[in-house]
């Protein structure tokens, strides 16, 4: 299995491609195992070759474990994404000048896998031509460690940048929240002052209302007293008028009596005194 096929099934995360990923991984492991067995059988001729084969076996197993871990990590990271959409999205993101954290992680893992595949291809071609030798394996292991370290530093720098961006956003949000809190506290003080003013106004209105009620009661009392006084005076005037009317009636009666007595002829008795009827 070549490098392009390995990268192809890493980027394609559909159900069929995941099955193909498992089968290709098993085939790759079998190929490594068979190649390792053949190389071990060939190198058993000398003690130096045997030591180199054992070192190569350990290194191959460690590298295989690293690749399996990377494959499992990539399957969890890029699961549920269409590879064609992922490629098109990554192109669009690079044109715009930025990409999502998920795509950055995928690109980082892809870079690591490419380095691993290149190392294995270089190792296999070199050993097929020149045979096993300890010193190139040692150099390759150092290069692998250096590349892993560089990839980790790259991912660390990306995480550091993301952390700085998140910290900056959090600080801005914290400032906004502090401003809102200060505004709410100021508004609360204003409302408390307004409440005190309303309490004072309410107390003033209550006092005014009590005074008005008191004045109203006094007015009603005074009015009733005035009405009583008016009634008394009215009764007195009525009685006085009636007395005057009676006096006038008596006078009229006397006058009438005098007129009637004058209208009749007077008669005298034997003594010459008028006779009254």
Curated annotation (Swiss-Prot):
Residues 33-168, 210-277 are annotated as: Disordered. Residues 86-99, 231-241 have a biased composition (Basic residues). One of its GO terms (cellular component) is cytoplasm. One of its GO terms (biological process) is nuclear-transcribed mRNA catabolic process. Residues 259-271 have a biased composition (Polar residues). It comes from the Eukaryota. The keyword Cytoplasm applies. Its main location: cytoplasm. It is found in: Cytoplasm. Keywords: Cytoplasm. Residues 34-45, 100-113, 151-168, 216-230, 242-258 have a biased composition (Basic and acidic residues). Present with 1730 molecules/cell in log phase SD medium. This is Uncharacterized protein YKL023W. It comes from Saccharomyces cerevisiae (strain ATCC 204508 / S288c).
């Amino acid at each position: 299995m070549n490098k392009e096929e390995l990268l192809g099934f890493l980027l394609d995360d559909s159900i069929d491609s995941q099955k193909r990923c498992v089968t290709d991984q098993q085939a790759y492991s079998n190929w490594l195992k068979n190649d390792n067995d053949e190389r071990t059988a060939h190198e058993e001729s000398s003690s130096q070759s045997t030591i180199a084969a054992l070192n190569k076996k350990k290194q191959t197993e460690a590298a295989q474990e690293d690749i399996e871990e990377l494959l499992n990590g990539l399957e969890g990271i890029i699961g549920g994404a269409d590879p064609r959409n992922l490629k098109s999205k990554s192109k669009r993101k690079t044109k715009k000048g930025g990409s999502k954290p998920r795509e950055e992680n995928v690109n980082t893992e892809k870079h690591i896998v490419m380095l691993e595949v290149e190392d294995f291809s270089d190792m296999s071609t070199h050993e097929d031509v020149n045979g096993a030798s300890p010193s190139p394996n040692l150099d390759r292991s150092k290069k692998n460690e250096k590349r892993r370290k560089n990839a980790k530093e790259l991912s660390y720098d990306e995480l550091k940048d993301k952390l700085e961006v998140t910290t900056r956003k959090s600080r801005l949000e914290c400032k906004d929240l502090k401003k809102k809190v200060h505004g709410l506290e100021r508004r609360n003080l204003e409302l408390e002052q307004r409440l005190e003013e309303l309490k004072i106004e309410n107390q003033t209105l209550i006092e005014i209302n009590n005074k008005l009620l008191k004045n109203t009661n006094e007015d009603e009392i005074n009015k009733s007293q005035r009405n009583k006084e008016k009634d008394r005076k009215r009764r007195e005037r009525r009685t006085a008028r009636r007395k005057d009317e009676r006096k006038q009636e008596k006078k009229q009666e006397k006058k009438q009596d005098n007129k009637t007595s004058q209208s009749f002829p007077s008669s005298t008795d034997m003594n010459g005194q008028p006779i009254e009827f």
